[in-house]
Structure formats: structure tokens, C-alpha cells
């Protein structure tokens, strides 16, 4: 029996000891995301045979993540399959990236059916691209930045500190009011995860920034490292009446992310056309494909998560 347990804030060191050394760049492995969304997925974890493993619920479907670690991956997968059998559920893993798919096909050939989940693909950027916006491909972005600076020459960027959490919460509440959050599917869950993250900002290991215009908050963003070379930006909110606020908070935060992080993961577009267009406009170097991987013995329709 795998000794799964609920994820808590106290598990940060245990989990990041695996994820920070890993080559996995998917946002699902961010400790902040794992904790902030646990209310929805009942996420649990365990450490077995030098691997970090996760199980969670996507609606009524039990699901797992690809194990993180080094060693006998095949043996660990067999234990996860046995765990699913004991739970009387089909064995499926969500968030399986292309390199993980290759590993599965190598060690358990012809055992899995892979279903691509484009809406959940992560957008990966070079930190240096977002921090400098150099080159012709970023001309429009530089124009946004320059226009913002000319319009609001006295703007201020400050880091998120405990005494500034409330103004972030206030902007989020106003953003939701303007964007009719209560009428859009999924925004209630997003709000709950965001509020949890802000209330547990330091315990989660988050860093972030706030943009002020005329002394008033107009944007904020935050995130944390996913692994040793990839930083995840998890949340970005701005006052849409302030032209260029989104572009400016993106630019300023990218300039504060330590240079050791080569990549920035700005997460998925959830199949939302406007969000996809915005993420593509920043010229990702990789769109990190994700798949649902289920045993061929138990084919499944695509699971939303």
C-alpha cells in the first residue's frame, strides 16, 4: 500500500527536494499550485523508491501524475497501477508531457493510449526575452511599455510583502466584479486558489510584484520556481482601464526573476481564444504539450482538470 498523505504547507521542503532537481518544467509541479488547488483535487503525495508520486481527483476520476525521481520507474508505475486497482479505478495519468510520454513508451511499450490536451499545454518563454523584449518580434510589446511610461511617468513597481497582500486582494475583487467572475465557469475555483496563495504567500515560497499608478495598485503578479531552471508565473491581474498595465507588470516582474532561471512558464490557455492569442504574442520558445495517458485495457474519454 502506498502511504499517500494530504499535501500541507509543511511538506514544501520534501516536495521541492524532488521537483527542483528535476528536468520537469510543467506548472503542475509548482508547490504553490499543488497546495492552492488541493481543495479542488484532493491532491495527495507519497515518496516511494526514491520517487515523488501524486494522486488526485479530476471530478469523479482518480488520476495520477508521472512520478518524479530517479530509479526504477517501471516498478513505481506498477505500484501506482496496483493502487488504482485497489481504488477500483482505471489507471490514468494527467499532465504527461512529450518527454514523459517517450519514457512511458520505452519502459511499457504498447500499454498506454495518449490523448493530447492542447488546452492544458504550458507556454514556456526565455526569461531574457521577456526581460529585454529585444528584436523586431517584440516591437509591439516595446511600444506598449514606452506608451505606459510616457502616460504614467511616476508609476512604481514594488515587491509583494505581507503588508501589501490586502491591496492585491482588493484589486482581485474589483477585477472579478468588472469581468463578471460569478457568471463564468471555473472562475470561482481560480479565485479560491488565488486567495489561498495570497494568504499563505511566504509559506508557499512565492515572490511577486505590484504596479502602482498615482499611489493606487493597478496590477500584481506572483509565482515561484518550478525547477532549477524554470520559474512559474502563476497569477497576473491588472486594472483593464489602465492601458498597458498587463504588459508592464509582465516586463517588470521578468526583470526581477533571478538570472539562474533560463525559462519562464506562464501556464496554459485553457482553450480560451483571447488568452491563447495573448500568450502566443509573447513568442514562446516551447509550447509544452500535455497528454492524458491511460492503460489501453481501460480507454477513457478526455478528463477535464
What positions do the PLM features span?
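Amide-forming acyltransferase catalytic core, primarily the GNAT-like/NAT-type
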Residues: 1-49
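Conserved donor-binding loop and adjoining core beta-sheet/short helix segment
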Residues: 28-99, 212-240
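Short, glycine/charge-rich beta-strand/loop segments that flank catalytic centers
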Residues: 90-107, 119-121
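Short catalytic-loop micro-motif centered on adjacent basic/acidic residues
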Residues: 92-93, 158, 263-266
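Acyltransferase donor/substrate-recognition loop-hinge adjacent to the catalytic core
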Residues: 110-184
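Short, conserved active-site entrance elements at the starts or edges of catalytic domains
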Residues: 163-216
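Aromatic (often tryptophan-rich) hydrophobic motifs at membrane interfaces
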Residues: 206-296
